[in-house]
């Protein structure tokens, strides 16, 4: 038992020793911490009586230079009104002060004050004021601690606002209000366990307006949905599909919102008394900017856009329909989809629609990856069509539509994917798709040197995924990436050619050819006639020098060609050089109305279509000529004698069964003018002047037949002037047969109608199909009345480019032709002489019925072309016909008569359609989208070639202005 008592005593002593050591250790640690605190903050032990001296040692005096951090800390203590005043006093521009913009204005103001030597105005709070306030409220925090806390708040505010200025999610409105109006520092520092005592104000009454869908909001829902309870507003939003709600301080504003009047109204915060003056200013101001120079962007009403009826396509449709059509190159299916719903291409915020999630590919990524150059071209053409963008935004003006077009096209061309940051140009170069590279690199908005995730440009990844591509293809891709340059040939009205400077669609500075721009009204108007390209810059410059100064071996030949053929000699030289070097070449042909290389497959197809159309016109002319004889007989029979002529005129002027005397009939007949021999001037002025009076019929010589059974008025006229034995009746007493007055009036109206049709030739020269139908129908009517000769009608049916003088000659021929009802007999020509004997197998030429220099020029352009009779039968027949003439005869062929000035391509080449069938940006209709075909041949003029240069230079200029 003794040993047990000893053990208890020992354990008790040991416990007391441990307890004493612990207390001593705690005391030592407390003293050490106390000493550390005193050494860190020697001013902590100061009293309230020593406040002025202590604060004077820390606070900055007026005129004292401060650091950037201290300046920012002091500016953080200002309320928005004081901060705005300081910014304005510093000579800086100030806008709305929010949680996002406050740090920007504070930083600008601090920099401005530091540059001015740190001179602070009296409105800025001193450190002494802050310190005094803190000690009055019994806080233990020092000005240095306040500076640290304010600096930390500034850093937190900067971190919180990061990204909002570059388009990321904005902060909540409650956060905006709380940061703009911070709680006073004195109210947040209490010595009751260092807890902030903040008194919240009572929330004002809010009204929640619920706005239904814009189109049918006032139809389906007659009542105006305004609620005072937020739960009721949320319940109404659930019941009304597609609606939205917003809180307002007044009932009137909520009712406006519920009616669909979406003017900008700031959402009320929980404490309306602390709203910033920028937010509380009037919404509209007729006086312009305020006196303090604030920007009133937020006070302006938001542009009301009418919502379109297109819904976002389902993910299944984007994958199974749109993406599959792009991958397979189904242009018609792709075009039908995007025109039926433009949201297949344009997503929310005018961003490209994503067709493959994960990698976030759009249509251009997929098309570039699958080598679908035609889909890439069709996508760009559709997006650049204002009518397509108008489907999404029907109320936008043209300027806004163009800005939207530039924005969406730039995104489609230069948006990287999510995985490797590869643009469509990266994909095209990576897989060696040279046609896609050609389409993309030729656009003026393309960025040719973007870097992907691994820091590589498109040039660095050429054929990275296709190792079996040839070296020539790799070089072509590199040349396309260098730029698309063209060597243009320009001509003035006097046909003097000029080889212009290099042209490119993405030129950044001066115009393409500054040497031929008109600096004076006396300078000739230069128009584009041919060009070579696209080429790399070095090749384009070398070809330009070679074209201007041919090689010594061929200098004599080329010089003789240029001198002997001033109209198209330099084109022949450039064509031969381009074909020899394998460069793309196109020239303008007036009879086709487009730029094309006739030796290419595309040029042969265009020529084949033109010749087939011309053969059809000649065949129709021949059929009209065969029927002209009987039609002329009918007209001449009406005017074969004065007896029947008078009968016709009398019957024409008798309307009903009213009683009329014979003398009145004779007087009316004498007042009808007969057609005299017209002239070209009288015919051209027939719209304003009346026809001249001709010979009057002698009523005394007219023997009017009376047939009471065949005529209501007692007068009749025979329907056929032939006798029983088939012979034609002759003129009475050997006098000339005069046409009936009714026929004369009909002919005058036919002439006026035909002249109006001829005038339309100059208004719409490119609408050949519609105009042909009108002219052909009118021409048949004129031939039936015996007014025009078939040769004159054929000239109007022809699809060639017409001049004013040519149409005037055609009109004169129609009125003075040998088949005219009056002049045909005077000239002694028999009816149907001109075209009744026309040969249906008449030889075919490009201009008119006789060979001309145009046939020789086209033959020279086809010198190196291989013409397949099975594919191009009309071209083969035409070439055989032309080759049937000897070279000396072909040299003597005259040039086509062009007595007037051209009214087509010489005015503006931007309106000409490309020979590849691509329409202009505004060439399609939303109801009938044009299905274009892309030609990847070297001899096809690109969409971004000099033929469309003015349009795409304007596009590039607008893009550069928008980037500024």
Curated annotation (Swiss-Prot):
Its main location: endoplasmic reticulum. SUPFAM superfamilies: Ankyrin repeat (SSF48403), LEM domain (SSF63451). Residues 29-964 are cytoplasmic. Residues 667-705, 919-947 are annotated as: Disordered. Residues 667-693 have a biased composition (Polar residues). It is a single-pass type III membrane protein. It comes from the Eukaryota. InterPro entries: ANKLE2_3rd, Ankyrin_rpt, Ankyrin_rpt-contain_sf, LEM/LEM-like_dom_sf, LEM_ANKL2, LEM_dom. GO terms for biological process: cell division; central nervous system development; mitotic nuclear membrane reassembly; negative regulation of apoptotic process; negative regulation of phosphorylation. Involved in mitotic nuclear envelope reassembly by promoting dephosphorylation of BAF/BANF1 during mitotic exit. Coordinates the control of BAF/BANF1 dephosphorylation by inhibiting VRK1 kinase and promoting dephosphorylation of BAF/BANF1 by protein phosphatase 2A (PP2A), thereby facilitating nuclear envelope assembly. May regulate nuclear localization of VRK1 in non-dividing cells. It is unclear whether it acts as a real PP2A regulatory subunit or whether it is involved in recruitment of the PP2A complex. Involved in brain development. Belongs to the ANKLE2 family. This is Ankyrin repeat and LEM domain-containing protein 2. It comes from Rattus norvegicus (Rat).
């Amino acid at each position: 038992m003794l040993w047990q008592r000893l053990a208890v005593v020992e354990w008790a002593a040991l416990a007391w020793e441990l307890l004493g050591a612990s207390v001593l250790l705690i005391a030592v640690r407390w003293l050490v911490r106390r000493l550390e605190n005193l050494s860190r903050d020697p001013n902590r032990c100061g009293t309230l009586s020593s406040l002025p001296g202590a604060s004077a040692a820390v606070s900055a005096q007026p005129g004292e230079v401060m650091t950037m951090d201290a300046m920012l800390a002091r500016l953080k203590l200002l309320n928005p009104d004081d901060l705005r005043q300081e910014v304005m006093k510093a000579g800086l521009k100030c806008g709305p002060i929010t949680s996002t913009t406050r740090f920007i204005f504070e930083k600008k103001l601090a920099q401005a004050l530091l540059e001015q030597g740190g001179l602070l105005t009296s409105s800025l709070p001193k450190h002494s004021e802050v310190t005094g306030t803190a000690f009055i409220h019994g806080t233990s925090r020092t000005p240095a601690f306040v500076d640290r806390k304010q600096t930390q708040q500034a850093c937190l505010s900067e971190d919180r606002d990061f990204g909002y200025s570059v388009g990321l999610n904005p902060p909540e409105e409650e956060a905006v209000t709380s940061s703009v109006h911070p709680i006073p520092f004195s109210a947040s520092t209490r010595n009751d366990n260092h807890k902030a005592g903040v008194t919240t104000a009572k929330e004002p009454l809010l009204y929640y307006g619920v706005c239904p869908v814009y189109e049918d909001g006032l139809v389906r829902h007659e009542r105006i949905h305004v609620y005072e309870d937020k739960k009721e507003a949320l319940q109404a939003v659930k019941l009304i599909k597609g609606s939205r709600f917003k809180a307002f301080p007044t009932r009137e504003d909520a009712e406006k919102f519920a009616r669909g009047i979406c003017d900008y109204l700031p959402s009320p915060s929980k404490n309306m008394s602390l709203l910033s003056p920028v937010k509380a200013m009037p919404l509209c101001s007729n006086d312009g900017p305020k006196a303090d120079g604030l920007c009133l962007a937020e006070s302006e009403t938001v542009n009301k856009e009418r919502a379109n009826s297109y819904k976002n396509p389902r993910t299944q449709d984007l994958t199974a329909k749109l993406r599959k059509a792009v991958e397979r190159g189904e242009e018609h299916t792709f075009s039908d989809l995007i025109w039926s719903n433009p949201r297949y291409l344009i997503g929310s915020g005018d961003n490209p629609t994503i067709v493959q999630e994960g990698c976030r590919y759009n249509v251009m990524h997929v098309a570039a990856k699958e080598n679908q150059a035609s889909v890439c071209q069709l996508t760009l053409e559709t997006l650049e069509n204002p009518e397509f963008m108008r489907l999404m935004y029907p109320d936008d003006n043209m300027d806004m539509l163009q800005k939207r077009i530039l924005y969406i096209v730039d995104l489609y061309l230069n948006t990287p994917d999510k995985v490797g940051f590869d643009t469509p140009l990266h994909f095209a170069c990576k897989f060696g798709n040279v046609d896609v590279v050609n389409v993309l690199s030729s656009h003026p908005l393309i960025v040719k040197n973007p870097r992907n995730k691994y820091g590589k440009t498109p040039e660095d990844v050429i054929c990275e995924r296709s190792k079996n591509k040839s070296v020539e293809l790799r070089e072509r891709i590199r040349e396309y990436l260098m730029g698309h340059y063209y060597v243009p040939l320009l001509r003035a009205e006097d046909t003097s050619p000029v080889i212009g400077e290099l042209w490119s669609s993405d030129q950044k500075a001066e115009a393409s050819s500054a040497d031929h721009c008109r600096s004076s009204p006396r300078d000739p108007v230069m128009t584009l006639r041919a060009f070579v390209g696209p080429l790399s810059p070095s090749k384009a410059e070398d070809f330009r020098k070679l074209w201007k100064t041919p090689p010594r071996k061929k200098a004599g030949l080329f010089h003789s060609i240029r001198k002997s053929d001033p109209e198209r000699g330099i084109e022949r030289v450039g064509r031969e050089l381009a074909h020899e070097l394998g460069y793309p070449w196109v020239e303008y042909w007036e009879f086709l109305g487009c730029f094309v290389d006739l030796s290419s497959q595309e040029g042969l197809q265009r020529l084949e279509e033109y010749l087939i159309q011309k053969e059809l016109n000649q065949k129709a002319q021949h059929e009209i000529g065969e029927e002209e004889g009987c039609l002329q007989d009918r007209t001449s029979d009406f005017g074969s004698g004065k007896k029947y002529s008078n009968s016709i005129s009398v019957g024409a002027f008798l309307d009903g069964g009213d009683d009329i005397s014979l003398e009145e009939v004779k007087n009316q007949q004498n007042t009808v003018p007969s057609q005299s021999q017209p002239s070209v001037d009288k015919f051209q002025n027939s719209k304003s002047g009346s026809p001249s009076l001709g010979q009057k019929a002698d009523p005394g010589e007219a023997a009017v037949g009376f047939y009471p059974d065949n005529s209501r008025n007692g007068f009749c006229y025979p329907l056929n002037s032939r006798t029983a034995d088939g012979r034609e009746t002759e003129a009475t007493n050997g006098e000339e047969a005069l046409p009936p007055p009714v026929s004369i009036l009909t002919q005058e109206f036919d002439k006026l109608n035909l002249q109006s049709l001829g005038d339309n030739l100059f208004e719409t020269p490119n609408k050949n199909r519609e105009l042909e139908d009108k002219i052909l129908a009118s021409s048949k009517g004129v031939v039936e009345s015996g007014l025009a000769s078939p040769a004159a009608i054929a000239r109007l049916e022809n699809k060639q480019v017409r001049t004013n003088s040519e149409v005037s000659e055609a009109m004169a021929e129609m009125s003075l032709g040998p088949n005219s009802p009056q002049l045909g007999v005077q000239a002694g020509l028999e009816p149907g002489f001109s075209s009744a004997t026309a040969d249906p197998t008449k030889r075919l030429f490009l201009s008119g019925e006789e060979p001309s220099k145009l046939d020789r020029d086209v033959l020279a352009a086809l010198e190196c072309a291989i013409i397949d009779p099975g594919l191009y039968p009309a071209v083969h027949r035409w070439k055989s016909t032309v080759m049937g003439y000897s070279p000396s005869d072909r040299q003597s062929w005259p040039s086509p008569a062009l007595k007037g000035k051209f009214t087509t391509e010489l005015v503006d080449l931007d309106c000409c359609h490309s020979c590849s069938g691509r329409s202009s940006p505004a060439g399609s209709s939303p109801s009938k989208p044009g299905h274009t075909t892309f030609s990847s041949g070297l001899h096809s003029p690109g969409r971004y070639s000099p033929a469309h240069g003015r349009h795409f230079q304007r596009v590039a200029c607008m893009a550069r202005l928008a980037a500024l």
